[in-house]
Amino acid sequence: MLKRCLSPLTLVNQVALIVLLSTAIGLAGMAVSGWLVQGVQGSAHAINKAGSLRMQSYRLLAAVPLSEKDKPLIKEMEQTAFSAELTRAAERDGQLAQLQGLQDYWRNELIPALMRAQNRETVSADVSQFVAGLDQLVSGFDRTTEMRIETVVLVHRVMAVFMALLLVFTIIWLRARLLQPWRQLLAMASAVSHRDFTQRANISGRNEMAMLGTALNNMSAELAESYAVLEQRVQEKTAGLEHKNQILSFLWQANRRLHSRAPLCERLSPVLNGLQNLTLLRDIELRVYDTDDEENHQEFTCQPDMTCDDKGCQLCPRGVLPVGDRGTTLKWRLADSHTQYGILLATLPQGRHLSHDQQQLVDTLVEQLTATLALDRHQERQQQLIVMEERATIARELHDSIAQSLSCMKMQVSCLQMQGDALPESSRELLSQIRNELNASWAQLRELLTTFRLQLTEPGLRPALEASCEEYSAKFGFPVKLDYQLPPRLVPSHQAIHLLQIAREALSNALKHSQASEVVVTVAQNDNQVKLTVQDNGCGVPENAIRSNHYGMIIMRDRAQSLRGDCRVRRRESGGTEVVVTFIPEKTFTDVQGDTHE
């Protein structure tokens, strides 16, 4: 019942009620004790007064017969007997009748007897009777005082029992209502601090502890949910950061790889494979233009190229099937403000989209590819200019030294030949041979100077061949056909000069000797070799064409040997002449091993 009465109260009110109860018990005990003690107050003084009356009685008895000088003693005793303190004490303790009897006896009998007595024996009995009455009065005061003191002790004991019961109740109540719930809350708080949100506080009732336990349970549940959400976000953020780290690492590796000195295929293929692994893009294809002509380009893909010459290369994936669903084709142009270098093509599956990071990755990689291709083309032009300048310098030095010496020797031989019959026959034959050798040397020097002065106005072999075909088309009077099938930048510039000179020499021979109406120049790739073919439908090369003074064929064979290749000149079965040159183009490998295979 007490529990039901206390349950609507809050913990603070319940504690206040317990404090009020203990205070009330204490105050009640103190009030009763005070009241009882107040009743005892004055009893000792009254007993002292009564005792003094006995002493004064014996003094008067000793003074018999009384005289005038003893009247102050009588007056003092009368004041004591009729004092207000003694009257109040007797009235409080129920001894008023006894006191009044003693007072009447004193006034009516004892005083007159003392005044008449001439000796002590006559009034000794009266004094003894008065003292006996005083003893009874004092005994009454003592009994009343002892009773009051016993009552105070009893009240104190009762109050102590009540206080002990209240203390026991308070301890039990504190353990049930405060200590145990508090331990549960502390245990739950400790569990929450250690990220354990599974514990719950089971606190009954409708007090503050129950409300706090319910609030902590709700908070723990919400924290568990929040932590789950936060952990999921952390995992997502971690995955995002790892992906960004992979992107940054890929961009750094790609930038390092693209700016190495390895061949273009070894630089681009790993980059395209890495891009396909980091994004949703599939069937990635990079087309690198030889010039601004989009039709003439070199393709780099992530799919294995069955026509690739290097079958042992692991740069392209093997056994990878293309995606069945083509999806959406995306394009990124590799161009700057001056030149278009190529285009990047890729397929995005249906219903998928590139994320912001993936889009930035592709854009950054496109910028890197553009910068790499621009730098390669610039370096190619610079290398070509350097080669042209070196050749022009060599041509000037040849012209200023050997050409002048040969011209001087020809004039000296001409002077000797002008002497005619003055010279012996053997000398004239020797001079004729010397002049023929000088003419041959002069012709070879002219061809050499022509070669060194040959200019490649555009980077790459194809523009130079196209320009040469246009030049000889004007000389032939009909178009010289060019069938160019090589990928861009397959032939280095120093080899392209020799190949171009061989083609020009073959066209020059056809112009001088073939009387052809059709000339076709074909440049193709056969496995890992480059094959140059110049065909005409003219009269054909004679069987004894290979002789010492046929300098055109000698020049073509010498240049083919410079290419570490082979040059064959033969008569076509259908008529005409065919010049075939085959060689393996050189590859520029990186000076430091490992630049492209981190």
Curated annotation (Swiss-Prot):
Xref: NCBIfam families: PRK10600.1 (NF007896)
Catalytic activity: ATP + protein L-histidine = ADP + protein N-phospho-L-histidine
Membrane disposition: Multi-pass membrane protein
Segments on the Cytoplasmic side according to the record's topology features: 1-14, 175-598
Span of domain HAMP: 176-228
EC number(s) per entry: 2.7.13.3
Any one GO MF annotation of this record: protein homodimerization activity
Transmembrane segments: 15-37, 152-174
Protein name (record): Nitrate/nitrite sensor protein NarX
InterPro entries according to UniProt: HAMP_dom (IPR003660), HATPase_C_sf (IPR036890), His_kinase_dom (IPR005467), NarX-like_N (IPR029095), NarX-like_N_sf (IPR042295), Sensor_HK_TwoCompSys (IPR050482), Sig_transdc_His_kin_NarX/NarQ (IPR016380), Sig_transdc_His_kin_sub3_dim/P (IPR011712)
Gene: narX
